[in-house]
């Protein structure tokens, strides 16, 4: 397999530990273990009681019954048996795409967005057409272009809701039209939902609640602020779940007892996490809006209830070298937009802890003005 390096992961692997002010990450301000244990109102007693009686064996190979039940509650019409635990959203995407794509098949993928959604099918031998989204449309997809791209042999349509790094959300009415287009050629639809909107969730519907040949991927990493658990999932119909069961034996076997117990506990306490994270989204988005209003060299399309965003930078320098200079000179970390095929900008992880965001933005402004004005 000839597979490309994931641009954003490569950049973060190389540079994130050098950062003093990390405003590049897409997770909503990661929880500490102490904060996680306080979620149950009993100092973590419910987690400790469950974990302390578990043997440190392989555990439930495809996720415990409790984990599957908690995930199924996130959807309207999901059989818990068709929930499969994966190694984060990354493992979920890998297994889902491998279960659908074959050499020579045709795939349509939203672009630009999270790179594995279009590069993985290509690495597996598919012919991939990019369904390009445009800034002038507020990063919303053009359905007429999707209709032109699908073919009788289209096997899969890949979308990202919300988009990483753009923060654009696909509402239910648009997703329903995507489903109708997929049905017209009997294609699967994979929707990476790790950034599923926390704000106004009634305006969006998971692909698995709209389409039998829909598969969603998700994890506790982004909306639930616990990426350390490395616990994600796929939800699909039984046909695809059975294919992924076979693949899991090659790619992971299991997520591990500790991760399963922790993820189950997090999902059981999701209401408290969502309340916390909605407050972070709203507070920090307003901080960035106010900063943007006074910063002539930056602009953005505000994200809608999700933790990831992209900002344009009006600077006489390519974004890659600028972000490296910024990091080395000030300690502020941004991901260059070119790592997402979005040059002249950067991914802004605006859901960092508030004090980090405020200092990071102030430092960024001072640096740009000193360097260019």
Report each predicted region and the residues it spans.
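Conserved PLP-anchoring active-site segment centered on the Schiff-base-forming lysine
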Residues: 81, 99-121
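Active-site phosphate-binding strand-loop segment of PLP-dependent enzymes
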Residues: 135-202
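Helix C-cap/helix->beta junction micro-motif
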Residues: 124, 184-185, 295, 330, ...
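PLP-dependent enzyme catalytic core of the Aspartate aminotransferase-like
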Residues: 77, 316, 325-334, 340-373
